[in-house]
Amino acid sequence: MNFNNFTSDLNGKTCVKCEKEAKFTGVDPKKAWYCQECFIQMVRNKFRSALSKKKIYKEADARDTLVVYDGSPSGTFLLNQIDDALKQITYKRLMVKPTVLVLVSESEEPEIQQVIKRVAEIKKNFLENVNWFIAHIAFCLYDEPSELKEFECNGIEKITAYKYLLASCSVPTYKKELERMLKEKCLQKLAESLKVTKCMVTDDADDLGRLALDQLCLGRGGSLSSLVTVAEKRNDFMIIRPLCDLSKREISIYNYLCKIDDHYIQFSHTQSQEKSVQTLTDAFIRTLEDEKFYSTINTVLSTASKIHNTNGKDGSRCSMCYVEVAEFQCETCSAVRNSCSENLNIIFS
């Protein structure tokens, strides 16, 4: 990775923390610039600050956590932060008991075997002394939680059924949304199988900003706050988003500076050519960023965090997406269900 990809217009820039020569900036180059040491510390502080906001680990008996690794730069950063925090011997130590979950979306056997081989290499660098499990998103199709096996891809026998289910969805927008919901369902079932109630995911600020706009377009505007917050409680399961304040740019720079940018897993994903709300949202945000509206994502997330649903105050939630609703199922999920020829109620029961 080229150093010049992360630096521009350095003339006269000084670090906002220590007044050394500045070399790196976050999302908006018009704002704060940092020297290398202060930039690394700033990124670490954002990660730790997100976890401390909700006092997620205040109870000693609820520290078991599923840490998701998806092969992305954000996933590598998350592993690095957990690994580093557990090595601390002072008050800075993160009181968490991690289990690493490698989440696979590849469907071909040779690619899955390559992932398993690569994971064995990556494990030597991060969290070597904790349990690692590999699972395909198709694990969500199991009727009941099942025992996970190490050193192999769990859920692989359900891949054909998973592909058939997605193919049965006739509307590209709803197919994308179904994929997202199946992924969350998969994480919940995996957590149940491991008897864990918390799950750290790799969603960063860029991912969440796009998600917020997607959900607004899909009619879930009243539930945006719960979908982008750092901790989302769902009955006996909690989704934790510790990267919610960090952009992909900040994460990529950090990984480069800390020399962990060679611990990714390259997947051969083919970009879908189907037009959908999600692809249009992504194109819209990219256009704004190209036109130097750097704060678009931050503005979206800041606004989304203030929007709360007035329905479902009695604790009722949609059976598929878990947003607060007054009915058994939200209108968006009803539309997703109707666009599929397969019965989704069995999966999301």
Curated annotation (Swiss-Prot):
The gene is tut-2. It holds the Pfam family CTU2. GO terms for molecular function: nucleotidyltransferase activity; sulfurtransferase activity; tRNA binding. It comes from Caenorhabditis briggsae. Pathway: tRNA modification; 5-methoxycarbonylmethyl-2-thiouridine-tRNA biosynthesis. It is found in: Cytoplasm. SUPFAM superfamilies: Adenine nucleotide alpha hydrolases-like. The keyword Transferase does not apply. GO terms for biological process: protein urmylation; tRNA thio-modification; tRNA wobble position uridine thiolation; tRNA wobble uridine modification. This is Cytoplasmic tRNA 2-thiolation protein 2. Keywords: Cytoplasm, tRNA processing.
